[in-house]
């Protein structure tokens, strides 16, 4: 199982442009959560190779702001495997485009389940 966890780790990089900002001119939290859910979904699907559905999120923390002119790397890794639910840890790392500063800006857990054709949970 450890090998599957390693192989399913997913990384996606985004540039922070004006269209992703909020009224305070930092990364909009809703945009960040959309990116997190997408990477979590890809991670869960790569791990299980089944149709996965987001069940819930847990403990999303906005640790530091992300400014325009930065990169955001979204990293997903399987954290816990249950009989029907899968927990994916997501971190967003902010990185200067033209410098060396890099820091963890946002983190959270996304919980997924695989559902059958009747939308009932099925074993992973």
Task: Write out the residue ranges for each language-model feature.
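HotDog/MaoC-like acyl-thioester-processing domains
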Residues: 3-12, 67-68, 79-124
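Generic preference for hydrophobic/aromatic residues in regular secondary structure cores
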Residues: 52-54, 70, 105
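Small beta-barrel nucleic-acid-binding modules, principally OB-folds
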Residues: 49-65
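Hot-dog-fold acyl-thioester-processing enzymes
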Residues: 1-53, 113-124
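Generic hydrophobic-segment detector
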Residues: 15, 19-20, 59, 66, ...
């Amino acid at each position: 199982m450890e090998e599957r966890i390693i192989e399913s780790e997913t990384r996606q990089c985004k540039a922070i442009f004006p269209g992703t900002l909020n009224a305070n001119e930092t990364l909009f939290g809703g945009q960040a959560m959309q990116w997190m859910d997408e990477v979590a979904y890809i991670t869960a699907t790569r791990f299980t190779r089944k149709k996965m559905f987001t069940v819930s999120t847990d403990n999303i923390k906005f640790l530091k702001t992300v400014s325009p002119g930065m990169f955001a790397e979204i990293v997903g890794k399987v954290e816990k495997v249950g009989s029907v639910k899968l927990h994916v840890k997501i971190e967003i790392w902010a990185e200067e485009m033209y410098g060396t500063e890099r820091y963890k800006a946002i983190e959270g857990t996304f919980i997924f389940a695989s559902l059958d054709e009747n939308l009932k949970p099925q074993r992973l």
